[in-house]
A protein has these predicted regions:
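Short amphipathic alpha-helical interaction patches enriched in hydrophobic/aromatic residues
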Residues: 15, 49, 76, 149, ...
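Conserved beta-alpha-beta core of the PfkB/ribokinase-like small-molecule kinase fold
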Residues: 18-90, 98, 107-108
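Conserved phosphate-binding/catalytic loop of the ribokinase/pfkB sugar-kinase fold
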Residues: 1-25
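A short alpha-helix capping/helix-coil boundary motif
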Residues: 8-11, 40-42, 150-152
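Conserved phosphate-binding/catalytic region of the ribokinase-like
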Residues: 32-33, 84-197
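Conserved short hydrophobic patches within well-ordered secondary structure
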Residues: 16-18, 28, 137-141
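Structural alpha-helical scaffold elements that stabilize or flank donor/cofactor-binding regions
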Residues: 3-4, 64-65, 93
Length: 197
């Protein structure tokens, strides 16, 4: 596994694939290894009550990963995982997290970066299926970070974060206009076409 992670730029994990062993341990190992080798690490809290015994069990696992994370995605409903929105700056400092994105559904998302915060409104579209919208959003956000040439967290700027948030919101907007989770995920070309309208 070590040889497979080192050439990459980023490792992403989410609580959904950490509900049980051996996947939990493998994800923790990959995140730590990536962090220790100077790679970017992303984590999506993405709490699903049908997959976990209870919220406390998910929070206990999430608490184990924060020290490795550069990019944290958390929904408005999951803010208790980090002690509430007002605690995000202190939480970031405590764990060395560079960017926290708080998703707000159709209302867009907020970013927290380097002592700054901002809001990117959602797009007004005719949604037919929200399945996969969060994954489309986060995939778009992270891909835009990488397309910006970011290879370490020191490369990040507020402008890069804002542009990635705009791109992620567009990706989510394209996704919700189609049926199905995976089939609805947009390509780079589709996102850029949407943004150029």
């Amino acid at each position: 596994m070590k040889n497979e992670i080192r050439p990459g730029q980023m490792v992403h994990a989410g609580s959904v694939n950490m509900t049980k062993e051996p996947a939990r341990g493998a994800n923790l190992y990959a995140m730590k290894l990536a962090h220790d080798n100077g790679k970017l690490v992303s984590f999506d809290v993405n709490y699903r009550d049908t997959l976990w015994e209870n919220e406390a069990a998910c929070k206990e696992v999430a608490d184990q990963v924060y020290d490795y994370v550069d990019f944290l995605k958390i929904s408005e409903e999951e803010l208790y995982f980090v002690g509430g929105e007002e605690n995000i700056p202190a939480f970031m400092k405590e764990h060395g997290i560079s960017v926290v994105i708080e998703t707000l559904g159709a209302d867009g998302a907020k970013y927290f970066f380097d002592g700054h915060t901002g809001h990117q409104p959602g797009h007004k579209v005719h949604a037919v299926d929200a399945t996969g919208a969060g994954d489309a959003f986060w995939g778009g956000f992270l891909s835009r970070i990488l397309m910006s040439g970011v290879t370490t967290k020191t490369d990040l700027t507020e402008d890069i974060v804002k542009e990635a948030l705009r791109y992620g919101n567009a990706s989510g907007a394209v996704c919700v206009q189609r049926m199905g989770g995976i089939p609805a995920l947009p390509t780079r070309e589709e996102i850029e076409e949407y943004l150029n309208k």
